[in-house]
Amino acid sequence: MAAIRVSRHRLETPRLPRGKALRIALVSDLHGRVPSGLLELLREEKPDLIAVAGDLLEHYLPPGEKDDYHREIDAHSPPLSRLFISFLRRVDSYFVGRRRKKASGEEENLAVLSLLGEMAKIAPTYFSPGNHERKLSEAERERVAASGARYLENAWVSTDFGAVGGVGVSPDGEMLKALSQGSGVRVLLCHYPEYHERYLASHELDLVLSGHAHGGQIRLFGRGLFAPGQGLFPKRSGGLYGRHLVGRGLCNTTRIPRLFNPLDLPIVTLEGIAPSEK
């Protein structure tokens, strides 16, 4: 597997005192793989928090079957993008099936869930679902619960610095409202970058963390070529967009190579600018 590149980002927030900082590692789109060197990098970076923004696992629906995720794409994507996504889905399903003749998807997913437990030993870890976590098996749910990570699907939890929330394929507006009105730093995990303008921009959040776009698969002149849910030349395929950080992912799931698009471990530091209390 290709080497992982660490990308670094900084943002200021008035919800932390000056001189204080919150360091977050964004892990996204493992798709049942265990990337070589990921745990070592996380230990070296010493994050205060690890955010796993979806598609840790890999689950495919049978060809032709649709769920809420596909209906969301159908409702918001241009027709040409929908056709291309449908084609890629069929190709991926074929090659994934061939790859898993020797190891079932369940076995691979359980292996990467062990990685989730190792991440939780490094720093408090929060996991929100992507489109591949639509249907978790009972064994997978038990492994997530035992990992020490917090699973957040349309839910949020208080922390010593503020709050962390996570949404699924159908964001809960009331949950988002409650999170954005909380005290302290407000961090949201949302797998789908295209949801930012659609559902999240109206909420006051310090940081939104996403994946899903895989960097646009092929990057030309600093822009991705294609992303599911956004189509050709996506607006948000990888990098920092204001207070929205999109990870480029940590694996390749298609037969199309990642060109000019290395595996990505983003590290974002939120730096406090509020006057310190005397």
What do the predicted segments below correspond to?
Residues 1-37, 45, 63-64, 73, ...:
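Acidic, histidine-bearing metal-coordination/catalytic regions of metal-dependent phosphoesterases
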Residues 4, 12-25, 149, 156-166, ...:
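Beta-strand-turn-beta hairpins that frame and shape the catalytic cleft
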Residues 31-32, 56-59, 131-135, 169-172, ...:
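Solvent-exposed loop/turn segments at secondary-structure junctions
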Residues 36-159:
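Core catalytic region of metal-dependent phosphoesterases/phosphodiesterases
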Residues 126, 193-274:
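Conserved beta-sheet core of the metallophosphoesterase superfamily
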Residues 137-138, 142-149, 155-199, 203, ...:
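Binuclear metal-dependent hydrolase catalytic cores centered on His/Asp/Glu-rich metal-binding motifs
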